[in-house]
């Protein structure tokens, strides 16, 4: 969707992110990927207030966990509703299998502090088709 003031697309964004980092034993990565991509992501994104999710795998670095997921939320409320609690309590063979290989996990809930809403964007050189001012 284009914004009237410029030609850049506008995407709904929440003001809270849930950051989840995990370390997984190499022999369990296939089971972990299957669980996260095929079950965990779709289930969580059904919960009202979850906006989006992006997953990353460490390319280089030390002292950090290999897998990262950034969940974008409207606010912290989705983590407190019954649907979220029911998903966490529901048995899942694929999740149980994947969890056997998770050796470390860290999680943090972050609230946006700047700008207060929306996103700060630098368009000065990111869009090469536009003339630079």
Predicted features by range, described:
Residues 2-133:
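Macromolecular interaction modules
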């Amino acid at each position: 969707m284009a914004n009237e003031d410029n030609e850049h697309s506008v995407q709904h964004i929440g003001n809270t992110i849930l950051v989840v980092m995990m370390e997984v034993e190499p022999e369990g990565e296939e089971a972990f990927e299957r669980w996260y991509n095929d079950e965990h992501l779709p289930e969580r994104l059904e919960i009202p207030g979850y906006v989006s999710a992006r997953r990353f795998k460490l390319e280089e670095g030390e002292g950090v966990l290999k897998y990262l997921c950034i969940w974008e939320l409207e606010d912290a409320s989705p983590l407190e509703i019954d649907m979220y609690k029911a998903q966490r309590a529901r048995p899942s063979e694929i999740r149980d299998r994947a969890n056997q290989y998770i050796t470390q996990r860290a999680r943090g809930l972050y609230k946006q502090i700047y700008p207060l809403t929306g996103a700060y964007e630098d368009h000065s050189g990111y869009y090469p088709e536009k003339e630079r001012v």
